[in-house]
Amino acid sequence: MSKQQPTQFINPETPGYVGFANLPNQVHRKSVKKGFEFTLMVVGESGLGKSTLINSLFLTDLYPERIIPGAAEKIERTVQIEASTVEIEERGVKLRLTVVDTPGYGDAINSRDCFKTIISYIDEQFERYLHDESGLNRRHIIDNRVHCCFYFISPFGHGLKPLDVAFMKAIHNKVNIVPVIAKADTLTLKERERLKKRILDEIEEHSIKIYHLPDAESDEDEDFKEQTRLLKASIPFSVVGSNQLIEAKGKKVRGRLYPWGVVEVENPEHNDFLKLRTMLITHMQDLQEVTQDLHYENFRSERLKRGGRKVENEDMNKDQILLEKEAELRRMQEMIARMQAQMQMQMQGGDTDSSTLGHHV
């Protein structure tokens, strides 16, 4: 009597079905179980609402004990690096978010070299990842590479400042730059559009490489294609941040209250906050891939070239030392040979003198 086949191994599909179609589900389950890692850097002058915006984006307080420096402290203030990591879980999906803040950027009177500290930090994370990747234990590498940089631009100017241009050009080959116009509630809608166009023109004029959202695939649904088009058209994002709940039209919303009305943070008609958050969430994977495939690979290739040249130089130095040692040894041997010849001649001369003296006696 034949045993009944276990039901869990019965193929419910049509004949010829193998099951490869379930691979994406396996990858998804594995990724969800492992969790995601993302590092966001925020750079901009003090007073542009960077901390408020980040807290608004992720509904968390990353800077509970921050002390705001006075004007006198800012004069000689240097750029600092403050990395805050928080574990966020939403519907079973875990995100290890690291926000790298740069207090002191642009505060000092002489801000020419203020971005060197930031560049060093970005390179250090690449260096650490390269070291861990080259080690024996590669299963538990923590990825602290900077995947995205929100660069905050002041709404009070008429475009990019020289410092903005210099900084973005200094890092655009190392990290994905997303330009953000801060405190958009200080501008009218027409002023925002003029400022956006001016900034984009100056970015193109100075050949600054910012992060470009990839085009939607042809097989994507129309809603996603339209969303991608709107996100692209919104760059640079003009945003408002607030952690205060106020009442507007009978409901509680996060926003800012003015004598003339309420600016709602999450109202797309008031600012680009929702678009910025949507861009970050929907393109988080692409930001990581561009970091891995472009910025990190550029760093890695250059680093290995420098390492190769260093090894070559060391080998050349060793060969040079050996040649010098051999030449010195030959000189010593020649000198010893000459000394031996002189001693031989002196000994022969002494024998002749002795024989002469004996003959006279």
From Swiss-Prot:
Modified positions (Phosphoserine) in chain numbering: 218
Binding residues annotated for GTP, in chain numbering: 44-51, 78, 104, 183-191, 241, 256
Record key words, sorted: Acetylation, Cell cycle, Cell division, Cell membrane, Cell projection, Cilium, Cytoplasm, Cytoskeleton, Differentiation, Flagellum, GTP-binding, Membrane, Mitosis, Nucleotide-binding, Phosphoprotein, Spermatogenesis
GO biological process, one term: regulation of L-glutamate import across plasma membrane
Keyword DNA-binding: no
Site (Important for dimerization) location in chain: 156
Subcellular location(s) of the protein: Cytoplasm; Cytoplasm, Cytoskeleton; Cytoplasm, Cytoskeleton, Spindle; Cleavage furrow
GO cellular component, one term: ciliary membrane
Region (G3 motif): 101-104
Region (G4 motif) location: 182-185
Highest taxon, organism lineage: Eukaryota
Region (G1 motif): 44-51
Septin-type G domain residues: 34-306
Positions carrying N6-acetyllysine: 190
Segments of this protein annotated with the region Important for dimerization: 260-270
Chief location bin: cytoplasm
GO molecular function terms listed in the Swiss-Prot or TrEMBL record: enzyme regulator activity; GTP binding; GTPase activity; molecular adaptor activity
Pfam families: Septin
UniProt-listed PANTHER family: SEPTIN (PTHR18884)
Other comment: Coordinated expression with SEPTIN2 and SEPTIN7.
Family: Belongs to the TRAFAC class TrmE-Era-EngA-EngB-Septin-like GTPase superfamily. Septin GTPase family.
Subunit details: Septins polymerize into heterooligomeric protein complexes that form filaments, and associate with cellular membranes, actin filaments and microtubules. GTPase activity is required for filament formation. Septin filaments are assembled from asymmetrical heterotrimers, composed of SEPTIN2, SEPTIN6 and SEPTIN7 that associate head-to-head to form a hexameric unit. Interaction between SEPTIN2 and SEPTIN7 seems indirect. Also interacts with SEPTIN9 and SEPTIN5. Interaction with SEPTIN4 not detected.
Protein name as annotated: Septin-2
Gene (name only): Septin2
